[in-house]
């Protein structure tokens, strides 16, 4: 049975199965509007989910009742629970490599319990893009790319050997080699089809392209009308094995776009403004669908930039409709005309083609309006993406923000730059300027604007500030090709923005070290140093450990701030520097207008560029091709590896789950505040030499220069466990004012490290809980932020609210996500974190899904809301997580 379309035994209860002709070819479809006429008033995203149910109907798991429930969806009624079979899965390596290690370990357990190894294999197409590993160590030189690539391969050889084994062993798995591109840009420019033409059956089939990805920014592909969202690596393993995702149909918010952006306003400005407004409005967990006359003012690349930051405004998906602009983008990126014909014919037949006249009849939960003409040039920072600052008020806003960072005491630092020049820097000194991230480098208009601005700056004689580390890491080689064709790459080079990698780099914290002369001066003085990047996240401590304030900006503004060298400036009125003629040069003097950008794009951006580049997408360089790629049914673990170790999730796993018990005598490991990110819980950046993980690696004989990052070592649980809650910016109320990975061991009263306390609790058989405020687990879809706590004995997290993916990850690891009663938190309830916690009602999961459980902590008792949202999630809790549940299900069906 193929994945996309069922066999002849499909019940087809609604008579949806049909055949359409496109250009003389016949294709099977499940005709949506004929089978379910009410689908015409559903939001586009729910139409896609409805087609998915019709196509996967089996009469048992996907039955007619699910179809009826979704077809009758009431925007203001209870949310029906449905199943969803994504057409494919995409992964980046930081989360994808652990998924493959989990699959390898699960396969071993499967064989141990009597299954056949080959049965446990991917059942849907999986593309893993290696983009998270490379670091921008070398910069500002013509050979920076080559040297960083060599360092990356040397550091990650073991991980890459595992990928080569997996690609050779597992069917349906493709690996996009390192330094080729960024997952979401590769997905946008090549992998996404909008409509899938599946020729694996006797009759070719057409159905919507849908995707889940092990990265929270997977919704970027929503810009092409492809429904998809981010999931944790834990949930992804089940999806890879063909298990449907279970979900409650979310709120769907219609966002009407009106007006046109003013000249000089970029897609980055639009998405930062939209992020601010939608985050304030409250769209957490919702699907957003964009419509309205303003769509005509946005290119598909602009739409993708907006969809990329969907997690930052809190939504699950941010869907743009399929229309002529989507076809134009597919053509511009080298997709064949035959496929464009299929996309149009299928979308029009199924009611998935955008119909402006019908927008008013769609059943949305609510509608909001966003005027593109209201957007002004902006940046966001210094700590959250939603903290937008209009460019005209940045100096004032910075003064307010820096006073919080430095406690009202201004700092200065004497710095010797890499070129030997000496400078006195003040708070706000820009020490890192990074054109990075698929969010913006996927957008030709933004990258061309940066190149044109650089050209004008060079022509007027502006020089780069020598203390600024400047990097350029686009999401695909197509970017450098069209910049070179336009002659703009040389100007970026002259300002220090030389190519360092094709990978995420600074956006995920792989900025590489600052020059030691700069970093040392910053550390010694306590200077409030600044990074400006074209990424999508600027959480505290994320970008570089020696940077205290992070601002998001468009690529041309990144170049501008690198020229200014400081955030303590009003770019709308003050000069960036002095030109070769001795006159001041302002931002207005070098800012390109839209006509210039469009003219360059017309001549430099060519479909052939994309076709040529992506034809060799899976090839890799000589180092990659030289790695062994021998298929073996079971992975050959190396006992002395410090990168890859068999995970302990399946140790002692039995064919049937053990009964659940209530939680008794639990102690609080951490008492945290609001907006605790997955970076706080499980860092991804460099491993400090003095940290518990660093000490552990040194004891194994690994020199500090080879520590690599937490993200790269995510397949060694011993390293990652020692890194839990060790972010230097973490604030734990139990840590007596110390930041970082410290807590109180309640058994002894001693202040100690998180890891040492967790070990002591485990040895004493004491379960753990974590207390938190709002938005616990925000940020990256980092499965280790749930895996780690589960392995050290955390049984429950009690918070005011949870970020969507992290809540799902907690459930996926068997940890209970519990919410305080509405309007309450640890402080209002009088909790100190020193209490012993009993949680009653957990054993009810054996029979049902309890809505609340009783929490007793000392003299305080309250009913916590159980955020186990579906019956299937309750099964995960019963089984101790999604992976044991999936393993047992495969054993039963084998």
UniProtKB/Swiss-Prot annotation:
UniProt binding sites for [4Fe-4S] cluster: 438, 504, 507
Catalytic activity: phosphinomethylmalate = phosphinomethylisomalate; phosphinomethylmalate = 2-(phosphinatomethylidene)butanedioate + H2O; 2-(phosphinatomethylidene)butanedioate + H2O = phosphinomethylisomalate
InterPro entries assigned to the protein according to its UniProt record, in alphabetical order: AcnA_IRP_Swivel, Acnase/IPM_dHydase_lsu_aba_1/3, Acoase/IPM_deHydtase_lsu_aba, Aconitase/3IPM_dehydase_swvl, Aconitase/IRP2, Aconitase_4Fe-4S_BS, Aconitase_4Fe-4S_dom, AconitaseA/IPMdHydase_ssu_swvl
MF terms (GO), sorted A to Z: 2-methylisocitrate dehydratase activity; 4 iron, 4 sulfur cluster binding; aconitate hydratase activity; metal ion binding
Note on cofactor: Binds 1 [4Fe-4S] cluster per subunit.
The entry's keywords: 4Fe-4S, Antibiotic biosynthesis, Iron, Iron-sulfur, Lyase, Metal-binding
Record-linked PROSITE patterns: ACONITASE_1
Annotated knockout phenotype: Disruption mutant loses the ability to produce PTT, but it shows normal growth behavior and is able to form aerial mycelium and to sporulate. Disruption of the gene does not affect aconitase activity.
A Pfam entry, by short name: Aconitase
Function (record text): Isomerase involved in the biosynthesis of phosphinothricin tripeptide (PTT), also known as bialaphos (BA), a natural-product antibiotic and potent herbicide. Probably catalyzes the isomerization of phosphinomethylmalate to phosphinomethylisomalate. Shows no standard aconitase activity with citrate as a substrate and is not able to complement an acnA mutant.
The name this protein goes by in its record: Phosphinomethylmalate isomerase
Annotated organism of origin: Streptomyces viridochromogenes (strain DSM 40736 / JCM 4977 / BCRC 1201 / Tue 494)
Annotated gene: pmi
């Amino acid at each position: 049975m193929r994945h996309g379309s069922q066999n002849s035994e499909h019940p087809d209860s609604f008579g949806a199965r049909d055949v359409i002709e496109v250009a003389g070819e016949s294709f099977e479809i499940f005709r949506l509007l004929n089978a379910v006429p009410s689908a015409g008033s559903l939001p586009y995203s729910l139409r896609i989910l409805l087609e998915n149910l019709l196509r996967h109907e089996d009469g048992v798991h996907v039955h007619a009742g699910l179809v009826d429930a979704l077809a009758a969806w009431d925007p203001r009624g209870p949310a029906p629970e449905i199943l969803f079979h994504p057409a494919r899965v995409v992964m980046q390596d930081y989360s994808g490599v652990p998924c493959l290690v989990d699959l390898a370990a699960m396969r071993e357990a499967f064989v141990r319990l009597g299954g056949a190894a080959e049965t446990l294999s991917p059942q849907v197409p999986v593309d893993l893009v290696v983009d998270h590993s490379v670091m921008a160590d070398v910069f500002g030189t013509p050979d920076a790319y080559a040297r960083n690539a060599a360092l990356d391969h040397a550091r990650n050889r073991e991980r890459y050997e595992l990928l080569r084994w997996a690609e050779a062993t597992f069917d349906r798995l493709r690996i996009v080699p390192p330094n080729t591109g960024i997952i979401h840009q590769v997905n946008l420019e090549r992998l996404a089809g909008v409509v899938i033409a599946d020729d694996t059956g006797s009759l070719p089939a057409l159905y919507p392209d849908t995707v889940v990805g092990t990265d929270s920014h997977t919704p970027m592909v929503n810009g092409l009308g492809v429904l998809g969202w981010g999931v944790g690596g834990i949930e992804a393993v089940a999806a890879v094995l063909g298990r449907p995702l279970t979900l409650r149909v979310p709120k769907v918010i219609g966002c009407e776009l009106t007006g046109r952006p003013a000249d000089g306003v970029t897609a980055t400005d639009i998405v930062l403004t939209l992020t601010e407004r939608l985050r304030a409005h409250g769209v957490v967990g919702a699907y957003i669908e964009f419509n309205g006359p303003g769509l005509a003012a946005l290119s598909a690349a602009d739409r993708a930039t907006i969809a990329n930051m969907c997690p930052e405004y809190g939504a699950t998906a941010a869907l743009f409709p399929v229309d002529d602009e989507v076809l134009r983008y597919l053509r511009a990126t080298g997709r064949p005309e035959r496929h464009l014909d299929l996309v149009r014919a299928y979308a029009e037949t199924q009611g998935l083609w955008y119909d402006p006249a019908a927008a008013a009849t769609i059943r949305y939960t609510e509608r909001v309006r966003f005027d593109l003409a209201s957007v002004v040039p902006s940046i966001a920072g210094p700590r959250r993406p939603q903290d937008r600052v209009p460019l005209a008020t940045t100096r004032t806003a910075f003064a307010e923000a820096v006073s919080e960072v430095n406690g009202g005491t201004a700092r200065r630092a004497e710095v010797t730059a890499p070129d030997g020049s000496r400078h006195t820097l003040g708070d706000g000194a820009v020490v890192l300027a990074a054109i990075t991230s698929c969010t913006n480098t996927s957008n030709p208009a933004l990258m061309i604007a940066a190149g044109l601005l650089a050209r004008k700056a060079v022509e007027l004689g502006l020089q780069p500030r020598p203390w600024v580390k400047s990097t350029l890491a686009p999401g695909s080689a197509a970017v450098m090709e069209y910049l070179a064709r336009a002659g703009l790459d040389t100007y970026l080079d002259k300002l220090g923005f030389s190519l360092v990698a094709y990978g995420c780099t600074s956006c995920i914290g792989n900025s590489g070290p600052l020059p030691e002369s700069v970093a040392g001066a910053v550390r010694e003085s306590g200077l409030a140093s600044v990074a400006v990047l074209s990424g999508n996240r600027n959480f505290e401590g994320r970008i570089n450990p020696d940077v205290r304030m992070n601002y998001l900006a468009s690529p041309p503004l990144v170049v501008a701030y690198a020229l200014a060298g400081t955030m303590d400036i009003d770019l709308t009125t003050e000069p960036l520097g002095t030109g070769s003629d001795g006159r001041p040069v302002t931002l207005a003097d070098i800012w390109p207008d839209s006509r210039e950008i469009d003219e360059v794009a017309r001549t430099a951006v060519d479909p052939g560029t994309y076709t040529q580049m992506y034809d060799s997408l899976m090839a890799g360089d000589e180092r990659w091709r030289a790695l062994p790629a021998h298929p073996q049914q079971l992975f050959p673990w190396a006992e002395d590896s410090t990168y890859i170790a068999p995970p302990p999730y399946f140790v002692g796993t039995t064919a049937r789950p053990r009964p659940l018990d209530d939680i008794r005598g639990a102690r609080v490991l951490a008492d945290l505040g609001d907006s605790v990110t997955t970076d706080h819980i499980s860092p991804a950046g460099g491993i400090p030499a003095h940290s518990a993980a660093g000490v552990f690696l040194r004891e194994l004989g690994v020199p500090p220069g080879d520590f690599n990052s937490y993200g790269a070592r995510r397949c060694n649980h011993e390293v990652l466990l020692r890194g839990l809650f060790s972010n230097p910016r973490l604030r734990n109320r139990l840590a007596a004012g110390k930041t970082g990975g410290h807590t109180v061991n309640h058994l002894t009263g001693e202040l100690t490290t998180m890891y040492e306390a967790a070990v002591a609790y485990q040895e004493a058989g004491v379960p753990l809980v974590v207390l938190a405020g709002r938005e616990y687990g925000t940020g990256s879809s980092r499965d280790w932020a749930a895996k780690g706590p589960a392995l050290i004995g955390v049984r429950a997290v009690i918070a005011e609210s949870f970020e969507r993916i992290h809540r799902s990850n907690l459930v996926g690891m068997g940890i209970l996500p519990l919410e305080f009663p509405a309007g309450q938190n640890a402080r209002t309830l009088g909790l100190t974190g020193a209490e012993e916690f009993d949680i009653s009602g957990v054993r009810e999961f054996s029979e049902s899904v309890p809505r609340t459980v009783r929490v007793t902590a000392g003299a305080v008792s309250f009913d916590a809301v159980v955020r186990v949202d579906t019956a299937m999630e309750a099964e995960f809790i019963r089984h101790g997580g999604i992976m044991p549940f999936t393993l047992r299900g495969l054993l039963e069906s084998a």
